[in-house]
Amino acid sequence: MAKKIQAYIKLQVKAGQANPSPPVGPALGQHGVNIMEFCKAFNAKTQGQEPGLPTPVIITVYSDRSFTFETKSTPAAVLLKKAAGITSGSARPNSQKVGTVTRAQLEEIAKTKQADLTAADLDAAVRTIAGSARSMGLNVEGV
């Protein structure tokens, strides 16, 4: 018989840097999950990624207090800010541009994100990422 699901927990944790402090500890502790076991498993799974990049994770907690988790790719906004070399997007994206990204940078981000996007092919994924860039106040070259 399948295990009964008790809860889904969605968090953003920095790759390779999960520890029992907030937000991880309180979110898992209230469901009775072994926090250190999650931290070790998460850090092992994300060790190939660039340390410090926020990584969305969905944790499924079962009624016997066991868990499974699935990691997603880093949010597009974080990757775009890194590519453009900025710390935050524009408060007025239509009138005030804060940086520029090229088609090559968009393609690199789209390849990273393609598994999590609903785009049919790489070109559609690039257009999706370009739209995110424009809404952050970035100029998009070559699209």
Curated annotation (Swiss-Prot):
HAMAP family, alphabetized: Ribosomal_uL11
* Any single biological process term in GO: translation
The record's Gene Ontology cellular component field reads: cytosolic large ribosomal subunit
Q: Which family does it belong to?
A: Belongs to the universal ribosomal protein uL11 family.
Which GO MF terms are attached to this record? large ribosomal subunit rRNA binding; structural constituent of ribosome
Q: Does the keyword Transmembrane helix apply?
A: no
| Keywords for the protein's UniProt record, in alphabetical order | Methylation, Ribonucleoprotein, Ribosomal protein, RNA-binding, rRNA-binding
Q: Which gene encodes it?
A: rplK
Please give the name of this protein. Answer: Large ribosomal subunit protein uL11
Superkingdom is: Bacteria
After translation, the protein is modified as follows:
One or more lysine residues are methylated.
Q: Which organism is it from?
A: Pseudomonas aeruginosa (strain ATCC 15692 / DSM 22644 / CIP 104116 / JCM 14847 / LMG 12228 / 1C / PRS 101 / PAO1)
- Function per UniProt: Forms part of the ribosomal stalk which helps the ribosome interact with GTP-bound translation factors.
Q: Which InterPro entries match?
A: Ribosomal_uL11, Ribosomal_uL11_bac-typ, Ribosomal_uL11_C, Ribosomal_uL11_C_sf, Ribosomal_uL11_CS, Ribosomal_uL11_N, Ribosomal_uL11_N_sf
Which SMART domains does the record match to this protein?
RL11 (SM00649)
Note the NCBIfam families from the entry.
L11_bact (TIGR01632)
Q: How does it assemble?
A: Part of the ribosomal stalk of the 50S ribosomal subunit. Interacts with L10 and the large rRNA to form the base of the stalk. L10 forms an elongated spine to which L12 dimers bind in a sequential fashion forming a multimeric L10(L12)X complex.
